[in-house]
C-alpha cells in the first residue's frame, strides 16, 4: 500500500492523453512478461531455486576452531538494484540453446565480476541433460565437499509440513507442475546434506545464472539442451520496485543508527530524515518508548524491506482459499493446470517472476563466487563450513586476520558497488530525493571483528553450534529457544562450564533423534 500510494502515483509521462504512473507502467511490464503458455510457466517455476543453504561434507559434525561469520549486507537488494533484467523470452531450438549454454559456461569469473550488472549477453530458462555429473576436481567445492543443486528439486512430490512457514497453496501448485514432469531427474544419484553430489545422468531446469554456477561447482562428460526459452534483450529493473528498495534502505539504516544512539528521556540530536513524522517528533522530544521503536524497526521497517524480494518471487497462479464448514481450505477449482491455464489469466499483476527468479539466482551466484575468491586468495588457510542464503561460517588458520578475509572478498564488494551505481543511475538522475547510495550492499560484513568463535560445529543445513568462550550460540531451524527458560543454549553452556569436554558436548548435544 505504501509503495502504491507514495511511489506508484509518480507520473512518468502520458499515454493516449492520460497520465502514466509508475504503478501503471509496472503493471503493464508485468503483464507483458507473464508466461504466455503453461509450458513456459511450468519451466520458469522449475528453474526457480531458493537461497543457497549448504553444509560442507568435509567438516560436517567435526568440531573446528577459530571460526568467523561472514554476512552479506542486504543480499537480495544487491540484485534488486544492481542487475539488468531480461525481457521478451521466446522458445528457441535445442541447437540454439546448446550454443547459448556453452557461451554462458565459457564466461570467465573475472568477466562476470567486471560486468556484474549484466554478466551474460543472453538469458535462458532451459531443461538440460548432463551426463556423469560430479563435483569439479581441483575446486574449493570438491575440497570442502560443497554441492549446489537441492535434492528437493528432484522430488516428484513435496510434502506439506504445517508450522514450517511454507504456504500450502504454493506447495500444491508446485506439485501440480511436477505431475506434468516439471521437476529435475537424476539416474543413479548420490545425495547428501540435501544436495546432489553426483549422478550418472541428470536433467535439470536452470536459468543462465544457475547454469553458470553449475559450471563452477560441477563437471560432466556431455551436455544436451532438451527445451527452453531465451532472450538477448535486457532493461533496467522497474523503478516501482527499486525506489521502494532505495527508500526502505535509507529508513532501515536510519532506524538502525537510532536504535544504537537514542536514549529515552533525552532529545535525539541527529538527523531524522526518512523516519515517519509522528515517531520523529517523539524522538526529538525524548519521549519515544525504546521498546516501541525497536518493535517498529524489526517488525515494520525490516519486514517491508525484506518483503520486496518475496513479492516478486510469488506465484500469482497459486490456488485460492475457500471457507468450508467454518474452516479455510484450498479451493481445488482454482488450481491451474495445462488444460485451464488460459482461464486463469491474472488481473492487475504486480509480480515480475522473471525478476524474482534472478534476484535469488544472483544471491546464489554471489555465494559461489565468494567461496572461490576466498580459496583463490587464501587457499588452504581457510575452510568454508556451511552457509545460508547470505552468510557463511569459515574456519581460519591462526595467522589469517579479518583484514585478509576482507581483502580476499574485495572483488565482489567492488563488483556489487559498480553494478548498483550503473543500474541505479536513472533513479539517481530522475529522483535524487528518493535515491539512496545503497552503501555497502553486496559486501561482506565480518561479525564481531577480531572476536572469532574458538569452537564451532556444523551439523546439517541450518544447524550449527558456536562457542564464544562464555556461552553457546545455536542455530537450528525448528528448535525453540525460549528466553529466560532452559533451552539448548543454556544446556550446552551449563555442560561446558561444568567441565565436560567442549568437543564432546558440541558433538553429542544435538542430533536427529
Spans of features found by a protein language model:
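Conserved acidic
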Residues: 1-513
Amino acid at each position: 500500500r505504501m509503495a502504491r500510494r507514495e511511489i506508484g502515483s509518480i507520473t512518468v509521462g502520458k499515454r493516449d492523453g492520460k497520465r502514466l504512473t509508475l504503478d501503471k507502467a509496472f503493471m503493464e511490464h508485468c503483464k507483458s512478461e507473464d508466461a504466455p503458455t503453461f509450458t513456459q510457466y511450468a519451466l520458469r517455476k522449475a528453474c526457480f531455486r531458493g537461497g543457497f543453504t549448504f553444509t560442507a561434507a568435509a567438516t560436517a559434525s567435526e568440531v573446528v576452531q577459530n571460526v568467523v561469520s561472514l554476512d552479506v549486507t542486504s543480499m537480495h537488494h544487491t540484485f534488486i538494484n544492481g542487475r539488468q533484467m531480461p525481457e521478451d523470452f521466446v522458445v528457441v531450438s535445442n541447437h540454439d540453446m546448446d550454443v547459448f549454454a556453452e557461451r554462458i559456461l565459457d564466461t570467465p569469473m573475472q568477466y562476470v565480476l567486471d560486468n556484474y550488472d549484466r554478466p551474460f549477453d543472453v538469458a535462458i530458462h532451459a531443461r538440460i541433460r548432463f551426463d556423469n555429473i560430479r563435483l569439479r576436481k581441483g575446486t574449493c567445492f570438491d575440497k570442502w565437499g560443497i554441492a549446489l543443486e537441492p535434492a528437493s528439486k528432484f522430488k516428484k512430490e513435496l510434502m506439506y509440513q504445517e508450522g514450517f512457514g511454507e504456504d500450502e497453496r504454493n506447495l500444491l501448485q508446485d506439485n501440480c507442475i511436477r505431475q506434468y514432469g516439471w521437476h529435475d531427474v537424476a539416474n543413479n544419484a548420490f545425495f547428501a546434506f540435501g544436495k546432489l553430489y553426483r549422478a550418472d545422468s541428470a536433467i535439470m531446469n536452470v536459468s543462465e545464472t544457475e547454469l553458470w554456477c553449475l559450471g563452477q561447482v560441477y563437471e560432466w562428460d556431455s551436455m544436451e539442451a532438451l527445451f527452453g526459452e531465451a532472450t538477448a534483450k535486457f532493461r533496467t529493473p522497474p523503478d516501482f520496485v527499486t525506489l521502494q528498495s532505495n527508500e526502505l534502505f535509507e529508513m532501515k539504516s536510519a532506524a538502525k543508527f537510532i536504535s544504537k544512539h537514542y536514549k529515552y528521556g533525552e532529545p535525539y540530536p541527529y538527523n531524522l530524515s526518512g523516519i515517519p513524522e509522528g515517531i520523529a517528533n517523539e524522538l526529538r522530544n525524548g519521549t519515544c518508548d525504546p521498546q516501541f521503536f525497536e518493535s517498529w524497526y524489526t517488525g515494520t521497517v525490516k519486514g517491508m524491506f525484506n518483503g520486496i524480494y518475496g513479492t516478486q518471487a510469488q506465484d500469482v497462479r497459486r490456488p485460492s482459499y475457500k471457507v468450508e464448514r467454518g474452516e479455510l481450505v484450498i479451493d481445488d477449482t482454482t488450481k491451474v493446470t495445462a488444460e485451464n491455464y488460459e482461464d486463469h489469466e491474472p488481473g492487475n499483476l504486480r509480480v515480475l517472476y522473471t525478476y524474482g527468479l534472478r534476484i535469488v539466482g544472483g544471491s546464489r551466484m554471489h555465494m559461489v563466487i565468494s567461496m572461490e575468491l576466498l580459496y583463490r586468495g587464501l587457499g588452504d588457510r581457510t575452510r568454508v563450513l556451511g552457509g545460508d542464503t547470505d552468510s557463511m561460517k569459515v574456519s581460519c588458520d591462526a595467522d589469517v586476520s579479518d583484514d585478509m578475509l576482507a581483502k580476499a572478498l574485495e572483488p565482489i564488494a567492488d563488483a556489487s558497488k559498480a553494478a548498483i551505481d550503473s543500474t541505479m543511475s536513472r533513479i539517481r538522475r530522475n529522483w535524487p530525493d528518493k535515491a539512496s547510495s545503497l552503501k555497502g550492499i553486496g559486501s561482506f560484513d565480518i561479525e564481531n571483528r577480531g572476536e572469532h568463535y574458538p569452537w564451532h560445529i556444523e551439523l546439517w543445513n541450518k544447524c550449527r553450534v558456536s562457542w564464544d568462550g562464555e556461552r553457546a550460540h545455536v542455530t537450528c531451524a525448528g528448535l525453540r529457544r525460549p528466553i529466560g527458560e532452559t533451552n539448548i543454549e543454556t544446556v550446552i553452556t551449563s555442560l561446558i562450564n561444568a567441565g565436560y569436554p567442549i568437543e564432546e558436548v558440541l558433538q553429542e548435544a544435538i542430533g536427529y533423534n
